[in-house]
C-alpha cells in the first residue's frame, strides 16, 4: 500500500509540475535514439589484443598507397602525381585490398600533419564497415616540434625558453596503443580475402602518403644482438666520452617539452646559483605514454660499439619507477633498450643501459651523426595494470547494482540478501579477488621497489574475500567497498604518469670514468652561501629584466603553480617584445581595501566577477573603450562575455575566465536502464521516477551564499534560477538597470519551477557531486563544465563510462529547445592610479591574446595535468585545448547559448535576496509568489539606496 501511495505521489507531482515548463504541451521529442550506446569495455583494444593473442602473426606487408585510395566526395583530394592525399576535417580516404593469408597485422601510417590550430590531428579507422575497438576512434597523431634557436638570455642574464616551432615533415610511425594498457602497437586480425579500411579525419587536416599493415616487430634479445655484433665484426671503441646536454634536443613530440631548469644542485650543467639556467628537460611535462624527445648524437669518431648513460632525476612520482624506450637510428637495439627503468629519488642519479645480467649493454653507432630517441612507456608492469583496470570496472559495476537495491544509506537492521538478489555476486567477488591476487603476484615477481606497491592491490583482494565469507555484512560495508575501488583507481592513475627529468646523456667507451651526478660536500656548502646572500640582493618578484623604469605591478587571483607559468611567459615573451618589466604577486582578496589605501596594483588579473563594477562605480578603474585595438580585442570572446564588466556604457574589465553549466551523465547506467540523455526539463521530470525506483537521483547546482560570495560570484553560476529565467524569456533588470524586472510572470514561473525541484521532487540541495556521480548514486547532474577536469583525473574508476551534454532546455513554440543559461568568470582590470596606463593596457592586451592564452593553457595543463585545465574566456585558446571533437562540439554549442548577466551597484543584494526567498519556501514552507514579491521589493529598495549613495541619476544615468 505504501509503495502504491508513493508511486501515486510521484505521478501527481509530475502532473502538477508540467504547467511550469513552457512549451511542454508540444509533442514530446522522440528521444529513444538519445539513449547512450554503451557496451562496457568489451570493445577496448586491450580486450581485442587478448582475444587474438593466439592468432598467427602475419608474414607479409600490405601497403596501401595514396594512388590506390578512394576519397570522400568532398574534403579530400589527391596531390599532383598521386604521391599523397590531403584529407580535411570531415573527409576520409578508403582502400579496398586483399589479404593473401590470415594473420595479425600491425598498423603503420605515413603522414604529415599540416599547419592548423596546433592540435594533434585525430583520425578514426573503420575496418570492414565498423570501428574494431575504441582506441581506433579519435586516435591522436603526434606533431613534430623543435627549438627555434639556441637558448638566449634577457637583460638580467636569465635564460629564456626558446620558441617552439612546428616541423612540417613526413612521419612514418606505427600506431601506438595510446591507452597504454595492452603492451603493444595497434593491430588488426585479417582473415584471408577482401577487406575495406577507411581513415577518416576528425580534427585538423593531414597529408597521407600510405597506410601499411605489417607483421609485428620484435626486439632482439641482448644475447642475439651481441651475437649479431660479433658476426658483423663490430668492435668496442676505446677512449671516447662526450656529454650531450638533455635540454638541447633535436625534435620532440609535444610543444611543452621545452627546456626547464634546476637550481638545487651545483652539479647540474650549466649551473648558476642566482640566474635561471635552462639546464634540464622533462619533469611532469614528459609523462604521457607515447611522448618522445630525440637527440643528435654527433662527433662519433668511428663505427663501433658504444655505451649510453643518462643523468636523471625522478622526484615527481613518489615511490614509482618510470620507463623509457630508447631508439637508436629508428629502432630499439635490443631488450636492454626497451623499457629502460628510472627509479624514484630526490637527488640526481646516473643510469647506464644494462642487459638482463646487469652488465652495460653496448649499441652500434656509425661515424659522424646518429639519432637517439627516448619515448615514454609504461614498462613491464603494463599487464598487471590492465588486470587492475579491468577489476576496477567490474567492481564498480557491481557496486552500482548493489546500490540500486540498498540505496545510498542501507538500513543496517535489514538483510537485503544481496548475494541472492544479484545472481553470481559472490562468484564475481571471487573472480575479481583472484584477478587482483594475480596482479599483485606479477608485481612481486618483478621485484625491486615495486614489490611494496602490491599492498594497494592486495588490500582490495582481502576485502573481497572477507565479503565472500560474510555475505550478510555486504550492505554494512558498502562505503568501505567503495573506498577500496577509489584507492585502486588512484593507484592506477598514478602508475600511468611517467615523469622524468634529465640533465644530460653520455655516449662513452667501456671503462671510461664518468662524472659524478651529485655535487661534493664543499660544492653544496658553496652553493648554499651563494644562494643565501643572493636572496638579499635579488628581486624575485619583478620579472622581465629589461631595466625599464616604467614597469608595472600586477596582482593575480590565481594559484601559485599558475603564477609561475605566467612569470615564464612574461620573461620569455612579454618583456622581450615590449621592454616592460612586471612585478607579479598572488593576491586573492582585498582589492578595494588596497585601492582605498593607495597601495593597490596597476593591473589585476583573475578579479572576481562582481568586483570590476564595484570598483568602477567608485571611479577606481580605467575603461578600455578609448584604447586603439579594443574593438579587435572584444572579438576574442563570446558575444556577451563583456557584459558583467560594463558600467555606464563603458567596459572596465576584460574576461580572463568564463564558466557555465553542462549536464553530466553516466553512459553505462543510462544505457542499462534505457534512459535517454535529458534534453528538456520535461525529460528531467520524466526521468526522476525511473531513477528513484532504483534509489538514484539527479543533481542540480546550488551554492551556499555568503557575504563575500554574494559580491564576488555574481548571479550566473550560483543555481538554476538564472537559467530558468532566461529560458522563460525573462531578465533581471530594466533597460537602464535602475531597478529589477523580476516582477514579470516569467520571473515568478522560473522561481516556482526552481523551488518545486526541491519541495515537490526532493532533490538534494547540498551534496558531493563528484562522489555521488562516481558511485552511480547520481547518474545525471548539472555542474560547471570544470567538473570535466575533476572527473577526468580523479574518477578513473568510471573512465569512459560518462559523457557531457548541453543543459536541459525549454521547448519554444517552434519546437526548438532553448538551452540559454547564465555564466560566471573573472576579469583583468587597470586601476586608475596606474603610473603607466598605456603599459598596463599592453599587458592586458597581451595577456588576453589568443597566443598567450593558448600558451598559458597548454603549460598549465602539462604542469598540473588535465585536472588543471584552465577555464579561459578566450575562444581560440579554449578550442585549442585537448578536447575530443564531441566534447568541443558540446561545449561550443552550449557556450553559444550563454547569456551573461549585467552587474550593477547593489547586485550583491539581488543574489542574496533571491536566495533568502528560496530558503524561506524550502525550509519555512512559505508561499513562493508572496515570498518572491517581498524580496523583490527589498532588492529595489537596496538598489535605490545604493544609487543615492553613489550619486547616480535615478532618471537616466543607468548603472
Where are these regions (language model features)?
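Extracytoplasmic/periplasmic substrate-recognition and gating elements
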Residues: 101, 301-302, 795-869, 896-899, ...
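Extracytoplasmic "Venus flytrap"/periplasmic binding protein-like
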Residues: 572-644, 668-679, 776-780, 787, ...
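Long, aromatic- and glycine/proline-rich binding clefts that accommodate carbohydrate-like moieties
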Residues: 807-809, 858-916, 920, 948-959
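C-terminal capping/gating helix-and-loop segments adjacent to ligand/active sites or protein-protein/ligand interfaces
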Residues: 446-459, 470-473, 477, 504-508, ...
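Glycine-centered hinge/linker elements that transmit conformational signals in sensory
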Residues: 736-766
